[in-house]
A protein has these predicted regions:
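Residues in the helix-turn-helix
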Residues: 52
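N-terminal intrinsically disordered/low-complexity leader segments
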Residues: 1-8
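C-terminal regulatory/oligomerization modules of transcriptional regulators
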Residues: 100-149
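Beta-hairpin "wing" of winged helix-turn-helix
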Residues: 61-77
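N-terminal helix-turn-helix DNA-binding core of bacterial DNA-binding proteins
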Residues: 11-49
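Basic, amphipathic "hinge/linker" alpha-helix immediately C-terminal to the N-terminal HTH DNA-binding motif
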Residues: 21, 72-94
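Residues within the DNA-recognition helix of helix-turn-helix
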Residues: 56
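Alpha-helical linker/hinge and terminal dimerization helices associated
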Residues: 26, 63, 91-102
């Protein structure tokens, strides 16, 4: 079955889906954002097959969202967010806010974010609920929330 090429549509949402629309891609970006930068770490956290993870990482590197950097002599590689990828974290944070509001359940959100600028705990959002400052990749520490289980 041929996948639709969203990248050629005259729509920014469709073009963004062409980059992160595969089911594992947003979760891989989330993992890299929270500090799982090595293949084995990402695979262990997500439980995704090596083949699928390899394909997704290659796609995200090819699209300029992740950068592949050697970290050992073998060589082995880790994956880091590029500027383009760090800005996609803002999209993920909007998804977190929606999911926390509509899908978290009685226990509450599974993840909380400590904003570096003010030190306060905030939920997933583009702005800190306490100081109102923007929250981007690198501006927060990720902590287990009450719904982490």
């Amino acid at each position: 079955m041929q996948r639709t090429n969203f990248g050629e549509m005259a729509c920014s949402i469709a073009r963004t889906l062409d980059v992160i629309g595969e089911p594992w891609s947003p979760l891989i970006l989330r993992d890299v954002f929270v500090g799982f930068t090595r293949f084995e770490q990402i695979q262990a956290d997500l439980g995704v097959s090596r083949k699928v993870l390899t394909e997704r990482l290659h796609h995200l590197v090819e699209r300029g969202v992740l950068e592949r950097r050697p970290y050992d002599r073998r060589p082995r590689y880790e994956y880091v967010l590029t500027e383009k990828g760090a800005e996609l974290v803002d999209v993920l944070m909007v998804m977190v806010g929606w999911g926390d509001k509509w899908l978290a359940g009685e226990a509450g959100p599974p993840v909380l974010y400590r904003h570096h600028a003010c030190g306060e705990i905030s939920r997933g959002d583009l702005r800190c609920a306490h100081c109102g400052e923007p929250m981007h990749a690198g501006d927060v520490d990720v902590l287990p929330g009450p719904g982490a289980g």
